[in-house]
């Protein structure tokens, strides 16, 4: 049965069970395309927000009867129709002859047979409102279209064992169906999105039959580049006005408008006339051209320009205070007019000073400073390759350390403790009013001494850590080397920022007039940046120290050839590799080091076939996200140890128990109990929870038993995963700070981690190759999804309270729940079908 323009309201929420089924929420208005589609009794083909799919007919209710099509000259009866759609906030497009101007919107006659007209999104710039939409509808759109149109993070709703958004499509930009192509007449007088200036009218006789918008032609309309035609004062701010293009006599300029407003290429004739030697300056970095070269502007302007001297005198509108580069005289002399891109020899873009973007650096997002394009050589860490190149082994910096494990650990802990005490000494001078003139005048010498010591102690620590990294590079397995390299990179990035800011402070001679601030300001200066980055150094150093000390037996081996090491710690204190810290720092007693080291669990002996487990470290803030890495095909004991270590890292119940509310504390305790449930692998004690039908004779009895056994395991841990996701979405919806939702995300990671481990274990035990491949692929997909979630969570914490970053984290976690459900279903299907 076919019907046109049939509308239905959703009576219940609908969770799709297949790809063809349409997801909707209670109260949604659907367009019914076909009832009992394809011979399926009770299933209707409907459309919602541009998506088509089948829906169960008993979950929707028809609003009106079918609307019969009428010829173009007939006039439909709009009365009841308008009343019904007015209640649903939809727009019924009437015939052009029967439109009521009081209650409906005027739509061109070409839409008279299109039925329900749903307003598309704007085609122009975001500032332009192409269609006038009532305020109530605009609020509805903003509240239901997700984070792109509202500032609130949209979290999906749990229905059964899955999650459904209020609107199913992610990042859905087109809320309404876009109407079909327009008729032959122009409808809207709106310029395209690239034209940001005023609309230029075109004579009526030049309108093309197929044109929809009144757009000026590309040739012969503008006397100057289009971007220079912006009359509004707001659009002219911080833009550059270039002189008009040069044309040959009788030939129009056909060069299209480019990305930058630069004069078009000159012709040979005009180029020869303009071959005048003068220093050319970078746009955006010079004084006004006419002020410096008025003689050229007034007396040497060619006739082809067709402009007066007054026009030329204000050719450039340049912001002040920016340095510039001048092209050498030889360059302009040797350059031929044919080889130039334009009238003026414009040098390459001079990178802006990095201090403007350094203002946003704080203690968490401290690495953004190293990628701001600074022109200073010692801060050129703007790419991953340059960062990694700084860690490349060189004979002078990263030479191997020939130390025995006890001596290396003793030296490492001494350097770490010295560094922590230096940072604590600096932090003790930072108070609420420490930047006021009176405080700075009394303590500026102490602050300067503390800053110098922090930089010195961090440099000494880095020297030792790079040597340990060089030792790790010689191991047969590079897993430990890669882990140490990531941890060392964070410390080295901090050292680069501290070195640069300390250098800048010394450049200004620690002037009180510069450093003393009597009133609060939004920008961060060099001293603020130094303090904020220095706060993060002890945690990063502690994480690296723990990794090195845990694997000291692997990294360090005594070298009998080095006689200066035979005498133990006393000789290493006098060796050239050790730099004595300040005498005021008192390190721990060597016995304390050994006691502290032996109190930590050491890993079993490593072999070539067993890579070191890199998940064990005490960690610093966010360290569990930075260090998260799943090692495939690991044993049950290693997996459980890794789970326990990840759970203990930044345990919020131990760190901030007094700051948590009662319901938060109980929620964390409940989740921790679920997470600690082990993954069973003893199938002899297992009893099937239900008898599963078997129709697949190709699967062996043993493989089927394994699939059913681990399916029950998946069912248990999948419920724990859903509970962890519910808790995460709840704290995101209530706008909890990063320390709360990061802690919740760890429970999500650990729960899904168990599903990956189940897949790896099953891969090793099943005999059928096709089943092994399917399980491995599903497990690998889950593992990659976990890494994506870790990165998304880290970005959400770094950019908090960015709605976009939080929404991306929510989307990734939602995808994880779907992939986990598919993984669980695949085990059941392989066992029963």
From Swiss-Prot:
- Gene name linked to the record: Nedd9
Question: What if the gene is knocked out?
Answer: Knockout mice are morphologically normal and fertile, however take an increased amount of time to learn new spatial memories. Reduced dendritic spine density in the dentate gyrus and both the basal and apical CA1 regions of the hippocampus, with additional decreased in apical dendrite length. The difference in dendritic spine density becomes more pronounced with age. Reduced numbers of osteoclasts in bone marrow macrophages, however overall displayed a normal skeletal phenotype. Abolishes ICAM1 distribution at the pericentral ring of the immunological synapse of T-cells.
Query: Which GO annotations describe the biological process of this protein?
Result: cell adhesion; cell division; cilium disassembly; learning or memory; lymphocyte migration into lymphoid organs; negative regulation of cell migration; positive regulation of cell migration; positive regulation of dendritic spine maintenance
The record's tissue-specificity note reads:
Expressed in splenic lymphocytes (at protein level). Expressed in T-cells (at protein level). Expressed in the thymus. Expressed throughout the brain however particularly abundant in the cortex and hippocampus.
Q: Where is the composition biased (Low complexity)?
A: 368-396
Phosphoserine: residues carrying this PTM: 295, 368, 779
- Domain spans labelled SH3: 3-65
Annotated region Required for interaction with PLK1: where?
A: 709-833
SMART domains this protein is in? SH3
Please note every region of biased composition (Polar residues).
304-314, 564-586
The similarity comment for this entry is:
Belongs to the CAS family.
Protein name, as recorded: Enhancer of filamentation 1
What cellular component terms from Gene Ontology apply here?
A: basolateral plasma membrane; cell cortex; ciliary basal body; cytosol; focal adhesion; Golgi apparatus; immunological synapse; lamellipodium
| PTM text | Polyubiquitinated by ITCH/AIP4, leading to proteasomal degradation. PTK2/FAK1 phosphorylates the protein at the YDYVHL motif (conserved among all cas proteins) following integrin stimulation. The SRC family kinases (FYN, SRC, LCK and CRK) are recruited to the phosphorylated sites and can phosphorylate other tyrosine residues. Ligation of either integrin beta-1 or B-cell antigen receptor on tonsillar B-cells and B-cell lines promotes tyrosine phosphorylation and both integrin and BCR-mediated tyrosine phosphorylation requires an intact actin network.
| Role summary | Scaffolding protein which plays a central coordinating role for tyrosine-kinase-based signaling related to cell adhesion. As a focal adhesion protein, plays a role in embryonic fibroblast migration. May play an important role in integrin beta-1 or B cell antigen receptor (BCR) mediated signaling in B- and T-cells. Integrin beta-1 stimulation leads to recruitment of various proteins including CRKl and SHPTP2 to the tyrosine phosphorylated form.
Lineage here is: Eukaryota, Metazoa, Chordata, Craniata, Vertebrata
List localization entries: Cytoplasm, Cell cortex; Nucleus; Golgi apparatus; Cell projection, Lamellipodium
Q: Does the keyword Electron transport apply?
A: no
The UniProt annotation puts motif Caspase cleavage related site at: 359-362
């Amino acid at each position: 049965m076919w019907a046109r323009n049939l509308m239905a309201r959703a009576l219940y929420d609908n969770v799709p069970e297949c790809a063809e089924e349409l997801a909707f929420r209670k109260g949604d208005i659907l367009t019914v395309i076909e009832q009992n589609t394809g011979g399926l009794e009770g299933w209707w083909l409907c459309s919602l927000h541009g998506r088509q799919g089948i829906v169960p007919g008993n979950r929707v209710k028809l609003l009106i009867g079918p609307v019969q099509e009428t010829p173009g000259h007939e006039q439909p009866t709009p009365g009841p129709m308008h009343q019904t759609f007015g209640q649903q906030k939809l727009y019924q497009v009437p015939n052009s002859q029967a439109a009521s101007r009081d209650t409906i919107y005027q739509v061109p006659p070409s839409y008279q047979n299109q039925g329900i007209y749903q307003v598309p999104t704007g085609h122009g710039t975001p500032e332009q409102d192409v269609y006038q939409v009532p305020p109530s509808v605009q609020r509805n759109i903003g509240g239901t279209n997700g984070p792109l149109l509202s500032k609130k993070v949209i979290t999906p709703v749990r229905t059964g064992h899955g999650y459904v958004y209020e609107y199913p499509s992610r990042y859905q930009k087109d809320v309404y169906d876009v109407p079909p192509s327009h008729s032959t007449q122009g409808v809207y007088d709106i310029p395209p999105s690239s034209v940001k200036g005023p609309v230029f009218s075109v004579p009526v006789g030049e309108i093309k039959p197929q044109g929809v918008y009144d757009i000026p032609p590309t040739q012969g309309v503008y006397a100057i580049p289009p971007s220079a035609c912006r009359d509004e004062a707001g659009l002219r701010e911080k833009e550059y006005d270039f002189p008009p293009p040069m044309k040959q006599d009788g030939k129009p300029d056909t060069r299209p408008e480019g990305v930058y407003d630069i004069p078009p290429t000159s012709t040979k004739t005009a180029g020869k006339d303009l071959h005048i030697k003068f220093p050319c300056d970078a746009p955006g970095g010079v004084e006004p051209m006419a002020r410096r070269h008025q003689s050229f502007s007034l007396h040497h302007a060619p006739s082809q320009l067709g402009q007066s001297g007054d026009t030329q005198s204000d050719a450039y509108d340049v912001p002040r205070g920016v340095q510039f580069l001048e092209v050498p005289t030889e360059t302009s002399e040797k350059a031929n007019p044919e080889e130039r891109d334009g009238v003026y020899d414009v040098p390459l873009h001079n990178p802006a000073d990095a201090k403007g973007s350094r203002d946003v650096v704080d203690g968490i997002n401290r690495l953004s400073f190293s990628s701001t394009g600074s022109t200073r050589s010692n801060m050129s860490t703007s790419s991953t390759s340059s960062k990694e190149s700084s860690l490349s082994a060189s004979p002078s910096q990263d030479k191997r350390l020939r130390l025995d494990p006890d001596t290396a650990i003793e030296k490492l802990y001494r350097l770490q403790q010295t560094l922590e005490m230096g940072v604590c000494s600096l932090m003790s001078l930072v108070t609420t009013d420490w930047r006021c003139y009176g405080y700075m005048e009394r303590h500026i010498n102490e602050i300067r001494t503390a800053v110098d010591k922090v930089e010195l102690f961090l440099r000494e620590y880095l020297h030792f850590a790079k040597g340990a990294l060089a030792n790790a590079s010689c191991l047969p397995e590079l897993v430990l080397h890669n882990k140490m390299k990531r941890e060392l990179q964070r410390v080295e990035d901090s050292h680069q920022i501290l070195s640069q800011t300390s250098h800048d402070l010394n450049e200004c001679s620690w002037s009180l007039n510069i450093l003393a601030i009597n009133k609060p300001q939004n920008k961060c200066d060099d001293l603020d940046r130094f303090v904020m980055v220095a706060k993060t150094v002890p945690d990063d150093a502690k994480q690296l120290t723990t990794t090195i000390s845990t694997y000291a037996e692997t990294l360090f081996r005594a070298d009998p050839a080095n006689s200066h090491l035979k005498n133990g710690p006393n000789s290493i204190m006098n060796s050239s590799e050790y730099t004595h810290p300040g005498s005021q720092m008192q390190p721990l007693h060597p016995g304390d080091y050994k006691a502290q080291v032996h109190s930590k669990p050491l890993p079993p002996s490593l072999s070539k076939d067993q890579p070191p487990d890199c998940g064990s470290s005490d960690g610093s803030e966010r360290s569990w996200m930075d260090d998260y890495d799943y090692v495939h095909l690991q044993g049950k004991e290693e997996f459980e140890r890794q789970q326990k270590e990840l759970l203990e890292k930044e345990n919020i119940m131990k760190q901030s128990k007094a700051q948590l509310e009662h319901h938060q504390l109980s929620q964390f305790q409940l989740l921790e109990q679920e997470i600690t449930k082990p993954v069973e692998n003893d199938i002899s004690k297992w009893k099937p929870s239900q008898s599963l039908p078997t129709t697949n004779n190709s699967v062996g009895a043993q493989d089927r038993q394994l699939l059913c056994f681990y399916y029950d395991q998946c069912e248990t841990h999948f419920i724990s995963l859903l509970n962890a996701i519910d808790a995460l979405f709840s704290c995101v919806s209530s706008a909890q700070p990063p320390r709360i939702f990061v802690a919740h995300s760890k429970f999500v990671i650990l729960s899904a981690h168990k599903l990956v481990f189940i897949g790896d274990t099953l891969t090793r035990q099943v005999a059928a190759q096709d089943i092994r491949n399917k399980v491995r692929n599903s497990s690998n997909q889950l593992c990659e999804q976990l890494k994506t979630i870790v990165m998304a969570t880290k970005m959400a914490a770094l950019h908090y309270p960015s709605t976009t970053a939080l929404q991306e984290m929510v989307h990734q976690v939602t995808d994880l729940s779907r992939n986990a459900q598919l993984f669980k279903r695949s085990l059941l299907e392989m066992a029963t079908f």
